[in-house]
């Protein structure tokens, strides 16, 4: 039996759908209300401002990513760097669109990315602390992040098959 998502999750899904369909520039409280089938007041109850909606989107992305890393660590015996790279490969197109929207909005409000900064700092620390070769692990993590950003910005000069061959 499918459980109906709670209102907050429904709103985050609606925001993600808007960004994926028409881009971050069209993400408004009114658009989220319409997409979610809720009133503007219902949206404002959960997210009193667009900034808080964006924070909710970021927290959702980070939680989702951390869950994927954990799942990969449980499925394979290997370092966190391997789980991180596999989790990045699992990212959906909606998640990429959300990340891009957050990045664009962070240009106006750099503090929006504070939770992501803490998350990445903790990850780099975890990767380095368990690595036999800290420099190599750091380079691998930086390369994986570079690959993800090139892909997110639609600048990656590799086919899906070529990218798949890299892991």
Task: Describe these PLM feature segments.
Residues 1-6:
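N-terminal intrinsically disordered/low-complexity leader segments
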Residues 10, 14, 18-52:
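Helix-turn-helix
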Residues 14-22, 68, 143-150:
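Solvent-exposed, amphipathic alpha-helical segments
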Residues 54-61, 68:
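Alpha-helical DNA-contacting segments of helix-turn-helix folds
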Residues 63-100:
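Hydrophobic alpha-helical connector segments
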Residues 84-88, 99-104, 140-147:
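Short alpha-helical scaffolding segments that buttress acidic/His motifs in well-ordered protein cores
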Residues 91-97, 104-105, 109-121:
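Conserved, surface-exposed functional patches that form binding/active-site neighborhoods
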Residues 110-167:
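Hydrophobic/aromatic-rich alpha-helical bundle segments in the mid-to-C-terminal region
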